[in-house]
Curated annotation (Swiss-Prot):
Compartments in which it is found: Vacuole membrane
Name of the featured protein: Altered inheritance of mitochondria protein 20
Reported function: Involved in cell cycle progression and surviving DNA damage.
An example Gene Ontology CC term for this record: vacuolar membrane
Nucleus is among the record's keywords: no
Annotated signal sequence range: none
Originating organism: Saccharomyces cerevisiae (strain JAY291)
Membrane topology term: Single-pass membrane protein
UniProt family annotation: Belongs to the SKG1 family.
Residue stretches spanning the membrane: 6-26
Swiss-Prot/TrEMBL keywords: Cell cycle, Membrane, Transmembrane, Transmembrane helix, Vacuole
Domain of life: Eukaryota
Presence of the UniProt keyword Cell inner membrane in the record: no
Recorded name of the encoding gene: AIM20
Length: 204
């Protein structure tokens, strides 16, 4: 009886023990394989993360460069668009220095009303002197207000006009017309132009 039980136990126990041992061996191998794969996966993840970080950095850098270039181009275009506008406004709003001074002192230079006559051609009467005002009328570019100061009576003037010699007439015609214009230049030299016009009226 005892031998039968031993034989049955050995016949059943030995294959079970062998199977358990083989299962343990395969389990150990699988565990080692899993560990190796985990280490390999960790290395791969590190490499992938590094590549992703580099690609993201490159893309961000390229985007920054493109945005900076676009901003510089926009600034240049804006400056180019503003230049003609600034030149137009500067040309439209330019006021010469003498005109600013005259406009500022317009009220102080003409405080009193005087009898004025606007003429295009200056006329010098014999025996009289023409006293030109220093303020130019801004609405008429070629007209000046005049103030005629008579030093002689009408009878003396008629006598002097009839008895005036040629030398006196020449001196009267060549008398310099003084314009107290501190802003007179080559383009606004009214004195020379008026003198030439008066010389052209002389009989030859």
């Amino acid at each position: 009886m005892g031998n039968v039980s031993v034989a049955v136990g050995t016949a059943v126990g030995i294959p079970i023990a062998v199977g358990v041992i083989i299962a343990l061996i395969f389990w150990c191998k699988l565990q080692r394989r899993y560990k190796k794969e985990e280490i390999r996966d960790a290395d791969l993840e590190k490499m992938v993360m590094e590549e992703v970080a580099v690609s993201v950095y490159d893309g961000f850098k390229a985007e920054i460069n493109s945005s900076s270039e676009a901003s510089t181009i926009n600034e240049k275009e804006a400056n180019q668009d503003l230049k003609p506008c600034q030149e137009k406004t500067a040309k439209a709003g330019y006021t010469p220095a003498y005109r600013r001074q005259l406009n500022a002192s317009m009220g102080t230079l003409r405080p009193k009303k005087q009898s004025t006559a606007y003429i295009n051609v200056p006329v010098i009467f014999s025996g009289e002197k023409v006293n030109y005002g220093m303020v130019r009328d801004p609405s008429y570019s070629f007209m000046y207000p005049l103030t005629l100061s008579r030093k002689e009576t009408s009878s003396l003037r008629s006598a002097s006009t009839s008895n005036l010699s040629s030398s006196t007439e020449n001196t009267a015609l060549h008398e310099e017309i003084k314009l107290d214009d501190p802003y007179e230049n080559d383009f606004t030299n009214y004195t020379v132009n008026k003198r030439e016009f008066i010389d052209s009226l002389r009989p030859r």
